[in-house]
Amino acid sequence: MKRSLSITVSLVGATSLLLLAGCTTDPSVESPAEETPVESSEEAGATEWFDQELFDKQFDERSVVPEGPEDKPYLQTINAEMKDTAEFASEGAKKLCFANASISNPWRQTGWITMNEQLKVLQDSGVISEMETRDAKDSDDTQIADIDYFIAEGNCDGFIISPNSTAAMTPAVERACDTGKPVVVFDRGVETDCAVSFIHPIGGFAWGIDTSEFLIENLKKGDKVVALRILPGVDVLEQRWAGAEKLFDEAGIEAVDHFTGGDPAEIKKIVSDELAKGDVQGIWMDAGDGAVAAIEAFEDAGKAYPVMTGEDELSFLRKWKDTGLTGLAPVYSNFQWRTPLLAMEKIFKGEEVPVEWVLPQSPITAEELDEYLERNDGMPDGHYAKFGGEDLPGYPKVWQDRVIP
C-alpha cells in the first residue's frame, strides 16, 4: 500500500510556476471583486489544499519534545516509526547520487553549502567516496532525466532525491527504488513510500499555525493583514497559507493575500498599494527573503510598523532588530540538508532509520532574536540562522564567504 508523502513537504503544480518558486506558496482565497473567475478558482484551490487531519497532526507535533541529541537537531526525530535497514549493510566507502531540484534561492543555497561540508566529514571518515550531483534547475523534465541518468549509469550505491514536484517525480523515484539501492527523499515529497526514509521538518501547516497565532495574539478582530506569497502550487507553501487563513477567518482578522513572484520590488509595490487604501496592521509571509522590502513600504509611507512574521533569514532578523517591530521568524529547518547524508551513513551500517523522519521546526521569538543574531554575526543577509552547521569544519568562513559548490 502506498503512503502519500506529497501532503507534507512537496511541490505540486506546473513547471512554469515552479521555475519561479523560491520556497513558498498556495492559491489565494481573497481577490478583487472584478476578478471573480480567478477568485472562484482560488477558493477551489484553498479547499483542495486544506487537510484537517494533517493540520491536527502538525498542530500536535509542534509541542512534541523531539528525541535525539539535544545539540544535534538534524538528528532529532518526532514520533518516529523505525525501519530495519539490515539488507543495505555493507563495508567500504559508498558513492551517492544526488538529484537536486535546484539551488535557486537563498534557503536552498544555504542548505547546499551545509550539505557539502557534511559530505567532507563523511568522506574523511571513509563512509562516502563521492556524491555525484545533478541540479535540475527547477525543472521536472530535467530532474527526471537526471534520475534516469543515474540509474542507467549503474554506479550509485544510494540515491538522495530532493524532488522538484510531487506527482511528476513519483515514477522516477520509484525507478530509483527498483534498482534495489537505498533511496532517501528529503525536503519535498512524492506519492510513493518506496524510499527507505522521507526526511522533512514538521511541515507547512505548522508554519501557518505558528505565524497566524502570533499575529492573532498581537492584533484585534477586524484588523487587516496583508499576506505575501510567492506563487501557487507548492504544497508545503500552500499549506502554510491554508493553515493561516483558517485561523485568521476564525479570529475575525481581515486577511488579503497577493502573489509576489518573490520579487522585492513587487512586494514593496503591493504593500504600498494596500497602505494607500487604508491602514494595515499585520504582514504575513510564506517566506521571509522579501521581508525587508515590505518593511520599507511602511517606512516610505510614514506608517507605523506592522506586526510581522518573516523567516529566519538574516536580512529579516537584522531589520527586525533595527526597527524594533513586533515580529516572529518562522523556520523551515535548514539543517535538514545534513540529515540525508547522515541517514545514508546509518543505512550502510544497517542501523534503523525513521520511515518518516520528522525534524523539529521552532520559530525564533523576540526573546531569542539577540541570541541568533550573535550566533550568526558576520554571516551574509541571505544566510539562515538555524542552518545547523556550527560544528562542521568549514564554519564559519565557508558560510560567511557564501561559497556555493
Where are these regions (language model features)?
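A residue-level marker of the well-folded mature domains of exported/periplasmic proteins
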Residues: 2-3, 23-405
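Secretory targeting and sorting signals
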Residues: 1-27
